[in-house]
């Protein structure tokens, strides 16, 4: 399974932080512009909370099937809300900006949101 540079950087950072995580990929028919499976990629436990981490693209027209992408994103958002699981969205982020401090701050922010 291919990973984007972004997800690879996040998993490397989680390893540095010694945070347990599992990489989960669903809906393999929906691919990113670079050909790796899209949708939520990362499930981790942060300070006692399960968090889903997902990357999204501003330009969904570059995806092979934009309608399918929108449909799947809606399913995923519903899942996160109905299961009360925080969803950390990372939009087209430059992976070089991701540091352990940046990631832990983002995770802290997402788990304090009111579900």
Predicted regions and their residues:
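Nucleic-acid endo/exonuclease domains
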Residues: 1-115
